Amino acid sequence: MTYQSQLTELRGMIEKIEYYKYTTDALIYWDKITYMPRNAIEYRSKVMSFLAGEQYRLLSDSRFQKLIRFFNGNAQNVFVTNAMIRRLIRNSESIRAVPEAEYQKYVELIAVSEQVWAEAKEKNDFSCFR
């Protein structure tokens, strides 16, 4: 495969990762501005956990890792490509340091605790966080 075809493949993979991230962020934002019903939090947190799992699998995919290694320090890279690769290495290493199931549970916990925090703040009662 040529340099350009591999770069195109990598960009396609990054695009998918960004779609999942954007969807997760949009879901959180939409729920905030529409004041999502209290009992909908469980479903939302499961959706967010699923999206996080998909992101995790893409970032830790063996082909994705192979492409990152190929571009890391490649003499044909322009400045922007080098910066992109540095960020991808940092992101993929940090996410792969945590097992996938644990990462998904973490995202689910964050989704639930965000709403609990908002309610606790409104009532000025943070005992539920002890």
Residue spans for each PLM region:
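A well-structured
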Residues: T2-R130
